[in-house]
Amino acid sequence: MNVIEAAVATPDARVALVIARFNNFINDSLLSGALDALKRIGQVKDENITVVWVPGAYELPVTARALAKTGKHDAVVALGTVIRGGTAHFEFVAGEASSGLASVAMHSDIPVAFGVLTTENIEQAIERAGTKAGNKGAEAALTALEMINVLKAINA
């Protein structure tokens, strides 16, 4: 039996983070968590990290696709927060961000990690951005690093 598993330490990885500006009071914490995980746990060098800000979560997929197509990155991490409000806007933005990023992941040769919070309220978002429920930005960054190594092992 052949079992493929991989570590997250990836010192030579080139990682792009695409982050939504909308709800930046939450997203700043996701970014901090992702950067900490990349540098401290993944041992990724500063010069190998690119951060791209976009207006909102809806713009994450097209930007992730553009980054993936450059060939300059080993993974893309998408970060953002969509909080349910009183209209159907939440369903449209959250759904399109999710399906768009999944499509980019399926059609590119690099991992695209999903670090987009989709919450019912601000409190849930705060909890998932570094307080009671961990930091989903850090988790997405670690997922990207592990997947870089998993795909390398599969293709070896």
From Swiss-Prot:
Keywords: Riboflavin biosynthesis, Transferase. GO terms for molecular function: 6,7-dimethyl-8-ribityllumazine synthase activity. One of its GO terms (cellular component) is riboflavin synthase complex. Gene3D superfamilies: Lumazine/riboflavin synthase. Pfam families: DMRL_synthase (PF00885). 5-amino-6-(D-ribitylamino)uracil binds at residues 22, 57-59, 81-83, 114. It is an enzyme of class 2 (transferase). (2S)-2-hydroxy-3-oxobutyl phosphate binds at residues 86-87, 128. The keyword Zinc does not apply. GO terms for biological process: riboflavin biosynthetic process. InterPro entries: LS, LS/RS, LS/RS_sf. The active site is at residue 89. It comes from the Bacteria. Its EC number is 2.5.1.78. Catalyzes the formation of 6,7-dimethyl-8-ribityllumazine by condensation of 5-amino-6-(D-ribitylamino)uracil with 3,4-dihydroxy-2-butanone 4-phosphate. This is the penultimate step in the biosynthesis of riboflavin. Belongs to the DMRL synthase family. NCBIfam families: lumazine-synth, PRK00061.1-4. Forms an icosahedral capsid composed of 60 subunits, arranged as a dodecamer of pentamers. This is 6,7-dimethyl-8-ribityllumazine synthase. It comes from Erwinia tasmaniensis (strain DSM 17950 / CFBP 7177 / CIP 109463 / NCPPB 4357 / Et1/99).
